[in-house]
Structures are given as C-alpha cells and as structure tokens.
Amino acid sequence: MKHKYLIAVSGGPDSMALLNKKRHLVEAVCHVNYHDREDSDNDEKIVRDYCKKYNLKLFVFDTHKDDVSKYKDINNLQTWYREIRYDFFEKISQELGIKKILIAHQKNDFLESAYMSLNKNKKNLFLGIRRKSKFRSLILIRPLLNKTKKSLEQYCRSKNIEFVIDYTNFWDRYSRNVVRKMMAEWDKKTFQKFYLKVKWFNLKNMFFIKLLDSKFNNWIKQDFDINYFLKIKNNYKESLIYLFLNHIGIKPNENKIEQIIEFINKNKNGSVKKYRLKENQFIEIKNKKILYSIC
C-alpha cells in the first residue's frame, strides 16, 4: 500500500495539526486512552469526531477496557505508557501491513530531549529526536521537528481544529516537565541559540552517524552475528549495542550497554547463559548469533 501511513493521535494540538496536514496519506489513526486524567475521554472524543468527519479508520486502545495485565510489573509510569503505546502501534501495524507511523514530536520536544541528554553527561552522538527512526518492526516518521508547539496551536486555531491541552504536561512529577517549564521561559534569542548549538553538534557527527547506521544495517543482515560485532572497532561497539537495544524496543542506558558488551565477550564461543534485559526479556548467544527472547 504505497504512501499510506498509520498516525499516532492523542488529541493534543501537535498530533491534531499533523493529522490535518497528512490525512490524505493516512490509512488509520491510532489513539490510546490511558485514563490518566479525569477528562481523558474528551481527548478520545475529539479524535473520534475528527475521524468520523473525514471518514478515517480509527483504532483505540483503552486501558479500562483492554487487557493491560502484561504490564502489571512495570513500576515506572512513563515506561508503562510507552510499552502500552508501542505494543498497540505494532499490533495495528501488523494487522494492516503498514510499517510506517507518523509521530507528532515537534521542535520543543526535540530541544527538551537534547537538553536532557546534555544534562545527563551521556556519550552523545546525536542530540534531540531523529526525524526518522526504527523501533521494533515500526518505522517512526516525525514531520514536525521544525515546527514549534506554539505555531502548531496557532495552526489548529486558524483551521478551527479542536484540540485538548494536557494539564499534566505542567506537573513537576516528571523531569521532562521541569525542563519544559524552564524552556518556556526562554526568550526567542535563547531558544534559537540553543537550537543552533544542537543542530551544529548533530551536523559535526553526521558522517560518523551515517557510517554507524551502515554498520548496524549490515549487522541486521547478518542476523546479529557476533563475529561481525567482535571485528568492529571498539569505538563503534557501544553505539551498535545502543542501536540494537532500540531495535528490539529496549530503552538503552550506559550500564546495560557495557554489560551486554561484556556478556558477548565472555560468551563468544557459545553458551546457554542468558542476559536479562528486563522482566521476562533476554538475549542469548546461539550458533554465533545474538537472539532476543521473551519468556
């Protein structure tokens, strides 16, 4: 099905603007009702009404109606949201045979992510959010990274598109919200200065990133053969494991990356041992290949 996409729509201004701009390319709309606010049903209604108006196919995951028992051991709320969301997107993707999904991350989200990465003193090759990335079997496409949240709200108002503002975005419960509130106080000059700093950082690393992507794609083609990995220069290995974890839908961190490299080095001759990624998810080495499993 050429040029057809799924789209994730929350009912907020970003995703409603994206839906309106790209609806001619959309095969189906995906909405998750987490029931995390008293008025979350209103978000769903806004999305339903829009889809009905333009005769768009809509799929809804409702945490009060659909089975969420598999997520009961997840203690971090943001991780809980993320796992539910992407499992749902992947399910619809497989049902419809469409791998590409439009995501409404915008310029503010991009800079918030960049700021948080810099604050963690991580070994960064790329700051912010990529326009296109792969997550499990999904291809995520973010067309709005050059648009500010304010401009998207203005767009919705100019087109009389109904949207909802999620008041939990202003709670200090989450570190991203603290960064969001801080950046909201920046003037245009400070905002643009930081944006250019991030873009320049990414531009400087572009050659290395492209080379790394090429090596990772070759590794995928070789079914994650450990001999291929072991021959790679050490300065690429951490980044390859980072991409591997993203590829299988596991959130990377430096400790996990270092432990996996150590696991591969210790078990390069084959072993029945498994490395636990989280809860019931593991990797093991069999026939010189890294295998991912859910038990």
UniProtKB/Swiss-Prot annotation:
Coiled-coil blocks: none
EC number, as in UniProt: 6.3.4.19
UniProt function note: Ligates lysine onto the cytidine present at position 34 of the AUA codon-specific tRNA(Ile) that contains the anticodon CAU, in an ATP-dependent manner. Cytidine is converted to lysidine, thus changing the amino acid specificity of the tRNA from methionine to isoleucine.
NCBIfam families, alphabetized: lysidine_TilS_N (TIGR02432)
GO cellular component, one term: cytoplasm
TM stretches of this protein: none
PANTHER family per record: TRNA(ILE)-LYSIDINE SYNTHASE-RELATED
UniProtKB keywords: ATP-binding, Cytoplasm, Ligase, Nucleotide-binding, tRNA processing
UniProt catalytic activity: cytidine(34) in tRNA(Ile2) + L-lysine + ATP = lysidine(34) in tRNA(Ile2) + AMP + diphosphate + H(+)
Domain writeup: The N-terminal region contains the highly conserved SGGXDS motif, predicted to be a P-loop motif involved in ATP binding.
GO biological process, one term: tRNA modification
Gene name of the encoded protein: tilS
Statement: the UniProt record of this protein carries the keyword Transmembrane: no
UniProt key word Nucleotide-binding: yes
Record GO terms (molecular function): ATP binding; tRNA(Ile)-lysidine synthase activity
Family the UniProt entry places it in: Belongs to the tRNA(Ile)-lysidine synthase family.
Subcellular location: Cytoplasm
Binding-site residues for ATP, renumbered to this chain: 10-15
Protein name: tRNA(Ile)-lysidine synthase
